[in-house]
A protein has these predicted regions:
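FAD-binding core/adjacent interface of flavoenzyme oxidoreductases
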Residues: 1-10, 80-160
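Beta1-alpha1 glycine-rich phosphate/pyrophosphate-binding loop at the start
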Residues: 2-81, 159, 170-176
């Protein structure tokens, strides 16, 4: 992107979500600006968690600011517009992103990186007893509530980590 008034905006690239991929895109365009390309980041979270540090954060090795990335300086470095909003709709006929409380945002190119959400609807009891790690921001809120509940209780507490990948093992070790 180039904010010079001599170079008009020719194309709009809109990034929805501040996940890993879009952080890399912002960094790339900050270091390799494209004249006439306007970048826009739409994100519901201005501080996005870095998932690789999640087990260390849960274990108490990192503070919030160490395990999260503030997207505002990164967007500024890339000369990107940043909107703190949640996308409610995409209008492909008019090439607009719709967010509550703001005018439509035009795009020529769009990239969506909003993270995953595990499907727990069809697992009996999951809504009452499971804490999916994704989306991470919701997990962290639930985790803090769980830690408070355990700390205030005199009863034994049993925790099961479901998932045998490297992330599951790291989370199991971090919760000890």
């Amino acid at each position: 992107m180039n904010n010079s008034s001599a170079i008009p905006v020719i194309k709009d690239l809109v990034l929805i979500g501040g996940g890993h991929s879009h952080r890399s895109v912002l960094k790339y365009f900050a270091m390799n600006p494209v004249p006439g390309l306007r970048l826009t980041l739409i994100t519901r979270d201005l501080h996005t968690p870095y998932s690789g540090m999640l087990p260390g954060y849960i274990a108490g090795h990192y503070q919030y600011d160490e395990a999260h990335i503030d997207l505002r300086p990164l967007a500024q470095f890339a000369q990107a517009r940043i909107y703190h909003a949640e996308v409610s709709d995409l209008d492909f006929e008019k090439s607009n992103v719709i967010c509550a409380g703001r005018p439509p945002i035009h795009f020529d190119f769009i990239s969506i990186n909003i993270g995953s959400k595990p499907g727990t609807l069809h697992i009996p009891g999951a809504d009452n007893f499971a804490m999916p790690v994704k989306p991470i921001d919701r997990f962290l809120t639930q985790w803090d509530q769980l830690v408070d509940k355990i700390t205030d209780s005199k009863n034994a507490f049993h925790l099961a980590v479901v998932g045998g990948g490297a992330g599951g093992v790291e989370m199991a070790l971090a919760t000890q």
